[in-house]
Amino acid sequence: MIGTILAVGFGGFLGAISRMLTSSFFNKIIPHDFPYGTLLVNIIGSFLMGLFFSYASSKGVHIFTKSLISTGFLSAFTTFSTFSYENLLFLQSGDYFHFFLNIILNVILCLLAVWIGFLIFK
């Protein structure tokens, strides 16, 4: 049990750092009127989650590895709380276009990404 807990913690540490670096990179190269960094991190993370679980279900990956990658790394890499906060800011500023666009893009593109990732090893 302690090994699994440490795996989740280490994976989370790496996932959070990766999210910060990836999101910051995309926010620097794409204009700031929309939270593209968060959107792209969520799409990438969703794709990787689908890819990993498709592979894991076909290859029988050990629980330690599942904990490290899915519960640890990928859960820390994607960010629903930031997505929610950015939507709150859009609502508070009356920017309903970006509010709805952000929700629609995150839900549809992340669902599509996890599905595509899953199909790769199916």
Curated annotation (Swiss-Prot):
Assigned GO CC terms: plasma membrane
Keyword Ion transport: yes
Transmembrane segments: 1-21, 34-54, 60-80, 100-120
Gene Ontology MF: a single term: fluoride channel activity
GO biological process terms held by the UniProt record: cellular detoxification of fluoride
Main location class: membrane
Claim: Iron is one of the keywords in the record: no
UniProt keywords, alphabetically: Cell inner membrane, Cell membrane, Ion channel, Ion transport, Membrane, Transmembrane, Transmembrane helix, Transport
Organism superkingdom: Bacteria
Catalyzed reaction equations: fluoride(in) = fluoride(out)
Record localization: Cell inner membrane
Pfam families, per the entry: CRCB
InterPro entries in UniProt: FluC
Any coiled-coil regions, as ranges: none
Membrane topology: Multi-pass membrane protein
Family according to the record: Belongs to the fluoride channel Fluc/FEX (TC 1.A.43) family.
Role, per record: Fluoride-specific ion channel. Important for reducing fluoride concentration in the cell, thus reducing its toxicity.
Protein name as it appears in the record: Fluoride-specific ion channel FluC
